[in-house]
Amino acid sequence: SEEKQLVKYFKTVIEPKLKEKDLEYYLIRNERIPELAIYSFSAGERFEPDFLLFIKKKNVSEIKSLQAYIEPKGSQLLLQDAWKEKFLSQIKDEHQITDLLGHGYTILGLPFFNQENRMNEFSKAIDELVNQL
């Protein structure tokens, strides 16, 4: 499944990049937890991305943290769920953090993880994400 492939990709490609930069990180599988649902900006459609990736810089005086939504998607569902990928791409620019802890905290969505059709986009997004920390 795409979910298993994502975990393998994380262990072999993403994790070494995070370790190289000495970043603290957690990849969390969202098992249909209602509190982790997000809603599209345009129509309020409910969406529960399969994975959340939390990354934090260690040992810095200024806290810099990042939360990324990751959605593995089988090729047969790419067109049907295109609205979800569009929504994920809007999160970084559209989100608003209203908590006092929001300073230095970034939320974003990544392109769908799909080994057949989306690896270039996904890999590029991961590299950009890691490089900004």
What residue spans do the PLM features occupy?
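Electrostatic, structured charged patches in enzyme active sites and in nucleic-acid/phosphate-binding
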Residues: 1-133
